Every structure is written in structure tokens, then in C-alpha cells.
């Protein structure tokens, strides 16, 4: 099959179609149009993952949320090898140890992006994936509470969390408290739907 770039398991929110992504053929998906963030229909089609990766190759790092998306390990690994992008794509595995194991077994050089839901997740990935993990994720609540922060930092990993939701949309009203909260908790990578606003604010405050 052909991998496409789609965050949700269904196409209801992001296109003018409905149902599960996996229930459609690639040809059928190409008949649909994407919606913008406000839900307005655009003239854009659903991109293949390969096309999206090619656009950013050598320019950005990709963070792909593929866990629980029914993405076959062999298909994902083959695509990254084909594009020579094993070192440019971080594969989000949450704390799914079986999926992480299967990915590493298929290609020992892949970059994995796990999430710590408990301290034993940190211990596990630190002991078994020292060459694969450079960044660990915490939930928004755990990050703001400072939970497990020092343990993750002690491994030499970057710390990732997100402000998607109210803290994110608040930036549209010039309220950056959610972002500042992450900075104060020493979060290195903050996921946001408003990267340009966040970058402008960080630059104005000389954080970058």
C-alpha cells in the first residue's frame, strides 16, 4: 500500500470525506480535498508520506506519530531507507515497547521518540535504546508539574511536550502563558499548531 500523511485515524476532521483512512484505496483518497485549520475546504489533496518527506529532506526533522495507526513496520522502514532519511525522522512510539522493539529489530539505526507515562518507561528506554532515543516526551500535565523531568534530563535527552489546545490558541490573543510555562519547566521541544507565533515570541524574548 501507499502511506499517506494523515494525523487522525479517520478523515472526517481533515477532509470532505468520512470514515477510516484504511478503508479507502489511495486512488479514492485522491478524490478528496483537505480542510484548513478552521474547517474550510481547500484545493489541496491528501499528500503521500513520501512526497511530504521529500519536501523537507535536508531542511527539517520530521516527527511521525505512527503508533496505533496500523502502519506496517516493514513499509515504514523501507520508505525511510529508500529516501535515506533514517537520521531525519523521529518515529513516535509512545510507551509501546513491542512496537519500539519491532522497529529497532527492522533497523537498529532508527530514531525513536518514546513517551514516559511512568518512571519505568524512562528506565526501559535508557537501558535498551541508548542509540535510538535522543528525546523523551511527557504529557502536558506531567511536564508542567515537573514530573520525571530530572530523570529524563539526566539521560542526556531532550524533553518534549505540547501545548496544543487552549494554551496554544491563546497565542492568537497574544497570551503566551502556556509557552512560558513550558520554558520555565525546561522543556526543549514544544509542539504547537502556531509555530510562527511561538518562534516570533521566543526570538523577542531572546530565548533563541
Which role does the model predict for each range below?
Residues 25, 45-49, 72, 76, ...:
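Stable alpha-helical elements in mature extracytoplasmic
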Residues 49, 55-69, 195:
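Active-site groove signature of glycoside hydrolases
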Residues 1-58:
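An active-site metal/cofactor-coordinating segment within enzyme catalytic domains
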Residues 18, 23-26, 82, 129-132, ...:
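Alpha-helix termination/capping residues and helix-transition junctions
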Residues 1, 8-9, 32, 67-69, ...:
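Active-site beta-loop-alpha junctions enriched in small/polar residues
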Residues 42-44, 62-69, 83-148, 190:
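Catalytic beta/alpha-barrel core
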Residues 34, 54-57, 61, 81-85, ...:
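Sec-exported extracytoplasmic/periplasmic mature domains
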Residues 39-41, 115-117, 123-208:
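C-terminal active-site rim and adjoining tail of enzyme catalytic domains
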